[in-house]
Amino acid sequence: MNLAVIGLGKLGLPLAALLASGGHAVKGYDKLDLVRSSIRSRNIETNEPGLMSLLMNTADSLEIVDDISSAIQGVEAVFIIVPTPSLPSGHFSNEYLLDAIEKIGQSIAENQKIVIDVVSTVMPGSCDGPIREKLESATGKKIGSQIGLCYNPEFIALGSVIKDMEFPDMHLIGQSSEWAGEVIERALGSIVKKPVPARRMNLKEAELVKIAVNNYVTMKISYANSLMQGSILLGGIDIDVVTDAIGLDSRIGHKYLKAAAAYGGPCFPRDTRALTALYEDLGLSGSLSLATQRVNESHTKFLAQRILSAVDRKASIGVIGLSYKTGTTVTEESPGLAIANELVSLGFHIAIWDDEGAGIGSDGDSTKFQFVSSEEELLALVDFVVISRPLNNPSRVAQLLRDSNKPYLDLWRQF
């Protein structure tokens, strides 16, 4: 198939590379000149496992172009993965998406049969509302037998994007018509490593499924964390014994039923807030998603208070793990950063070491913390250590903690 990918960021580039490795002729476009030139030269900065090897093997099948009209020319489907940032209300902004849709629509040839596939996460009602309107206005044609519209969000995590795309639990496809959904299902089917169930439905159903899935996961995390809080206050309870037993019930299961740090990252928090905002728009309470948010926010404060009760007020505290998960340097709404900020607000000096090499993003204040380059340097500086997420080499950290005899709190109980 002849395909295009618009937006070559952390998700778009892996998808483009996978489609190109799946036997398709793929054209990729990003509005940033530096991104395009870096990909052309295969000289990109990434720690996404498997991405560079894919790029090196797709020199003949992945073409980077300099404008959207060149990307759209002659393709059967275009995948759009541009940012849909969260607004203060919790809703997603469609500004960048609608701009891309307009340019794509204006570039479609008179007799070209094409499917426009929105991969970016959007609010329910977006595809049948402003996105459809913008596309039909730009093309001068109704969505139907010649132009199809699909919504196909990815369920992935940074640090395992390639693996998550190759081994998904399902392909979720919202479709304007059967033929449009078939085109997208066929393209996605070429990149998976095992048979995957596809669920094709109308556009609004798929939009709701995307944020509902992530809301269920965050609800499960907050449920486990609320149990942890109660267990600590009750005393004499091993929370892992409790959640292990609960997870054996087939109606519940063990996945994400782990009491640890608060949830974070670029997807979980914003999808949870979006469902709350949606329910408020509908005149419903949205109490479950709102409660999930509130438990998550209170959990970091609860953990900080437990640390406060265990150390001297003049103690220096080290935080190991700044990125929101193992395998990435992204710190967006990371639990480690949240704990560090909370401890600073309580008056503690905070030193940070991250085994992924993460630093504070552009939206954070790095001057509040002391960054160190190794575990040994951290342990030499602090009186108490907090481990905020799973580590790449927990046994090494465990040995260093034993040797230093430093007290610590491992939120994930890795050793």
Model-predicted segments: where are they?
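Structural/interface elements that position substrates and couple domains in central-metabolism enzymes
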Residues: M1-F415
